[in-house]
Amino acid sequence: MNASDLIRIMQFGDSVLPVGAFTFSNGVESAIQTGIVHDVATLKGFVLTALKQAASCDGMGVVAAHRAVVADDRDGIIRADWAVNNRKLNEESRLMATRMGKKLAEMSIHVVEHPLISWWLEQIKNGNTAGTYPVTQAVVMAAQGIGQREVVVMHQYGVAMTILSAAMRLMRVTHFDTQHILFELNHDIEKFCDIAEIGDINQMSSYVPIVDVLAAVHVKAHVRLFSN
C-alpha cells in the first residue's frame, strides 16, 4: 500500500471525522443504564458482539457496494444500500446509518470531488436510496481506489470506536482500558472481515435481539446523552 492510500484510509477512518458519530453510542448507553455493561470485561464483550453483528450485516453491505462500484453497477450500489437499511429493525439504528451516510457524502463531494460521489448524494437527496453510512463509506473509498478489505477494516474500527468513545463518557473506564480493548480485538476483527467479504446481500443478517431490546429501552429513557 502506498502512502497516499494509507493517509486517505486514516483520514476517512478517523473517529473524529465530521459525520456526527459522536452523537451516537451504538447501543452502549442503554447497555450501561440497564447494567448489561458495567466494567471493562462486559464492555469488551459488548463491543465484540457489535463487531460480529456489523460484519454479518453492514460489513457485507460494504463489500457488496464496493464490488458494485468497481463493476460500475450503480443499481447494485442502490440494492446494497436498501439491503442494509431494511435490516435495521429499530428507528434509532436507521437514523444513525442514514444521517451519518448523508453527512459523509456531503463532506466528501468537497474533499474528493468525484462524479460518483456527486451522483450518490443526488440519489440520497432525491429519495432514490437510503444513503446508509456503510454503503456511502464503500462508495467514497472505492471511488478513491481503496480496496474492499481496507474499507471493511475501516468500518469495523468505526463501530468499535463509536462504542468505546461513548463508554468513556458514560461509565468508569479509562483511555488505557478502551485502547487495550481495541488492541485485544484485532484478531477478532480479522475474522469478522472474512465474514464480511462473503459480500452476499442475501446472506446478510442483523439478528441480535439484545440490540433491539436496548433500542426500545433507549427510546423511553428519561435521560439520554446520545441519539441511540
UniProtKB/Swiss-Prot annotation:
Keywords: Chaperone, Cytoplasm, Nickel insertion. One of its GO terms (cellular component) is cytoplasm. It holds the Pfam family UreF. It is found in: Cytoplasm. It comes from the Bacteria. One of its GO terms (molecular function) is nickel cation binding. Required for maturation of urease via the functional incorporation of the urease nickel metallocenter. UreD, UreF and UreG form a complex that acts as a GTP-hydrolysis-dependent molecular chaperone, activating the urease apoprotein by helping to assemble the nickel containing metallocenter of UreC. The UreE protein probably delivers the nickel. PANTHER family: UREASE ACCESSORY PROTEIN F. Belongs to the UreF family. This is Urease accessory protein UreF.
